[in-house]
């Protein structure tokens, strides 16, 4: 599959911290993949709780403007940078949004509220055909955060007890799934019974 890639694309950009009124849909240069990077055609992007905090400046982090928001997304590889050999154009991918050296997408490096975005090939996860782009786009930040807590930082083992607060949210649901997959006994708490039904 070969795709003609325009030199310009549409993207959501903001030039200063503020409110949703500071987001603008406009033309910008289409990024080109550097060595060991891929260019992804964004098929679906999702907002998470971090995006409004980034837009408002609540995080206190230095943002290089203009910035494109959104770290949660899924798409198809449109171009390969030099040195990328494990991926093919057209592969359906779901990248982890924290990029080595560059930081969090939509915070310190351009996010995915755009037609195209470049990421290192090392952060790609191949999407199963049965998973929609929309479903996959809702997962990276929540599931990445939960995986880091349960597997990397917590090193949860079979038989251990895990308390998940905020169990009805994205990170909570993902934490429950990862902890159960590791054989832990899970105690879940949420602000209401309707959230525990998730």
What does each model-identified segment do?
Residues 1-10:
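Basic/polar N-terminal segments that are highly enriched at the extreme N-terminus
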Residues 29-46, 58-99:
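Glycine-rich beta-strand-centered segment in the early N-terminal region that forms part
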Residues 118-126:
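Structured surface patches comprising rigid loops and adjacent beta-strands/short helices at the edges
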Residues 100-109:
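Short, Lys/Arg- and Gly-enriched loop/turn segments at beta-strand edges
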Residues 92, 136-198:
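Mid-domain Rossmann-like dinucleotide-binding core that forms the NAD(H)/NADP(H) cofactor-binding site
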Residues 63, 130-139:
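Short pre-catalytic strand/loop immediately N-terminal to key active-site residues, enriched for Gly-Thr
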